[in-house]
Amino acid sequence: MKPDNIGFTLDGDLKVFDFGLCTCVRQRGKCVLSYEMTGNTGSLRYMAPEVALRQSYSEKVDVYSYGVILWQMASDTTPFKGLTKTEFMRRIIRGGERPKIPVLWPSQFGSLLRACWDHDPRIRPSFEKVVLLLDIMMKSRILQ
């Protein structure tokens, strides 16, 4: 997932598109929640560490990417701008560096972003939880 694959319809509805690299996993007509995918696809700056390291991964890679996109939207800054691929691999993928969260941002929002970026995908929240927490933050005017 990356910003280039997010857009709006003429009616203003948000859409995610370009599913050329996605994988639908089904077993007996049901989606499988636990599966293994491998490969090094996508845009590095939004890529979860396990994808960049060519390890098995799950849907939690999209939670990581979404967290980076949320940070980019809130900061109006391209994440990891100016890093070479080698620097990115050393600092971000292997070193665990993440985008800086400004002190003035709501702490709940910062905590959510950090959870989305956790190096361990098992620690990352589900998309359902991310949506729920963002909804709570918006309704309580923590995010505006």
PLM-predicted stretches and their roles:
Residues 104-117:
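Conserved C-terminal C-lobe helix
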Residues 62:
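Conserved catalytic-loop aspartate of Hanks-type protein kinases
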Residues 34-50:
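Conserved activation segment of eukaryotic-like protein kinases, specifically the C-terminal portion
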Residues 118-129:
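A conserved short helix/loop substructure at the end of the activation segment
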Residues 75-79:
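Structural helix C-cap motif within protein kinase domains
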Residues 54-59:
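Activation segment
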